[in-house]
Amino acid sequence: MLLALALLAGNASAAGVDAAEHDAFWLWSGVAAQPVLAQARTLYVLQGQVSAPRYSDGRARLIAQGIAIPRLKQGEVWVVYRAHTLHWNEDIYRTLLSQLRRWRAAGNPVVGVQIDFDARTRYLHEYVDFLQDLRTRLPKDCKLSITGLMDWGSNAAPETINRLAGVVDEVVVQTYQGRQTIPNYQAYLPRVARLQLPFRIGLAQYGQWRAPDYLAKSRWFRGYVVFLQNP
C-alpha cells in the first residue's frame, strides 16, 4: 500500500498541471482527498497556522488546522505550519513539538517539519535567524523544509542564500500565488536553477508549467510538489 492510501476518496479531473504525473503533494485544510494520493511517496500535510498577534496580550497563536492524525506506513511525511509572523512564543514551540511527537507515535513516517512563510527578500536575513533557532529546537532526526518565493534567486543577497544552505534541508520554490500560477514564472527560473541547496519546484494543481531543459541538469533539483486543490 502506498503512502496515503487511507486518504483516498473522490474523483478529480486535471487540466494544466496534472497531479497524476507526480508523487509529492501538499494536502491543505479544506481540500478533499483525491485518487492521486494513492501514488504519493511524499506528503506535506498542513497541521497549523501561526497567526500574528491580534489581541491585547500581543501574543501570536498556533491554530490547529488540517486533517486528523492518520496512520500512514510508507513514504515520507512532512508536517507543515503556515506562519504569518516569526515572533513565536514558547507555547507555539511546545505545541509544534507535541504534534510532531503524536504524529510519530501513531506510526507515521514523519521525516520533518516544513515552514510556509512568505519572507520578502529584504527580510530574508531575519527569516534565516528564525530558522536557525527553530532548527536547534527540533529533534536531531527531524529535517527542516521551507517554502520559498521565486524572486529570492533574483533579489536576495548571495550570502543570505548561502546561510540558508547551512540551516534547511530543502526549499520548495512556489511558482504560484494564492491558487494561480504566477504569469511570468519562467523569467525567474534561470536563477532558481542556480540555487546551491536542495530545492523542489512547487506547482499549483490545474495551473501552468513548462519545465525548462536546464532545470533537471542542476545537481540540487529534487523534483516537484503539487499543491492539491478542489476542482
Regions found by a protein language model. Give the residues of each.
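Bacterial N-terminal signal peptides
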Residues: 1-9
